[in-house]
């Protein structure tokens, strides 16, 4: 799920799992800023911040940034969103967004990771970048003894649920635990990924998540892991550094919105 700007797609026929090579910046590049918002962030404020930061990174006036946030309950519609997939349109606010993909949910208990990296200094390959983001999630889950998997026909990270009834075709049921939706402008990424830590999974009922029917959603707590967001953040950072290289802490996270659930 991505929306690159014009002329930014390279034709690649390899599977995503085969695309993982080096996504490190050159050795002389400064570490990526790692920012954690101290309070919930209004979605429109987040978009404006990403737009500004991505422009500064492209201009060479700011270092790359990873920004971890939570949002109040809301739905976002990507550039491929089908109106029929918004099942309960008045449940939460709905935001049209420039990222690729379809409908998704953000809310309390979900870690949203906005990734603003300059792929010109890393690797100008959109599919490889998406695969690298999946690898960050998979490594994060692996550190908690959860096996996350990618699927070639579905972007994101999935967890098998053998304890659930099998699918109609007899295969093992599987739920989505993390979603990815990105956009590129001048080869700088923004938007990013979301990992379900302990959101209210019933809030996903208002949409067909990512336009994919027949599969459910899950979270770390739903899988039986009583984890805290701060613990997940540490593991996310370690996994990110394995894939993309060093980071440095930044403390001026932005957060103003209130977390309000139905």
From Swiss-Prot:
Per UniProt, where does substrate bind?
Answer: 99-106, 179-181, 192-194
GO molecular function list? lipoyl(octanoyl) transferase activity
Q: Which reaction does it catalyse?
A: octanoyl-[ACP] + L-lysyl-[protein] = N(6)-octanoyl-L-lysyl-[protein] + holo-[ACP] + H(+)
Q: Which InterPro entries match?
A: aa-tRNA-synth_II/BPL/LPL, BPL_LPL_catalytic, Octanoyltransferase, Octanoyltransferase_CS
Catalytic-site annotation from UniProt: 210 (acyl-thioester intermediate)
| Enzyme Commission number(s) of this protein | 2.3.1.181
Which keywords does UniProt give here?
Acyltransferase, Cytoplasm, Transferase
Q: Which family does it belong to?
A: Belongs to the LipB family.
NCBIfam families in the record, alphabetically? Answer: lipB (TIGR00214), PRK14341.1 (NF010921), PRK14345.1 (NF010925)
Q: What is this protein called?
A: Octanoyltransferase
- Organism, as annotated: Sinorhizobium medicae (strain WSM419) (Ensifer medicae)
The upper taxonomy is:
Bacteria, Pseudomonadati, Pseudomonadota, Alphaproteobacteria, Hyphomicrobiales
Chain's gene name: lipB
């Amino acid at each position: 799920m991505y929306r690159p700007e014009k002329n930014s797609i390279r034709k690649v026929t390899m599977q995503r799992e085969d695309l993982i090579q080096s996504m490190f910046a050159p050795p002389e590049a400064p570490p990526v800023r790692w920012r954690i918002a101290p309070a919930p962030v209004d979605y429109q404020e987040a978009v404006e911040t990403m737009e500004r930061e991505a422009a500064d990174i492209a201009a060479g006036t700011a270092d790359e940034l990873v920004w971890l946030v939570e949002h109040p309950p809301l739905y976002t519609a990507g550039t491929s969103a089908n109106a029929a997939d918004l099942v309960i349109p008045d449940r939460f606010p709905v935001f049209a967004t420039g990222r690729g993909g379809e409908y998704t949910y953000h809310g309390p208990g979900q870690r949203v990771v906005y990734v603003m990296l300059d792929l010109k200094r890393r690797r100008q390959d959109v599919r490889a970048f998406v695969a690298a983001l999946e690898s960050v999630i998979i490594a994060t889950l692996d550190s908690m003894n959860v096996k996350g998997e990618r699927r070639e026909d579905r972007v994101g990270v999935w967890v098998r649920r053998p304890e659930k009834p099998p699918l109609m075709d007899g295969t093992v049921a599987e739920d989505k635990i993390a979603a990815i939706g990105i956009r590129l402008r001048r080869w700088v990424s923004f938007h990013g990924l979301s990992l379900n830590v302990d959101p209210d999974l019933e809030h996903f009922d208002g949409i067909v998540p990512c336009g994919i029917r027949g599969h459910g959603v899950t979270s770390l707590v739903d899988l039986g892991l009583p984890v805290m967001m701060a613990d997940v953040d540490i593991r996310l950072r370690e996994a990110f550094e394995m894939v993309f290289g060093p980071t440095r802490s930044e403390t001026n996270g932005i957060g103003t919105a209130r977390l309000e659930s139905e």
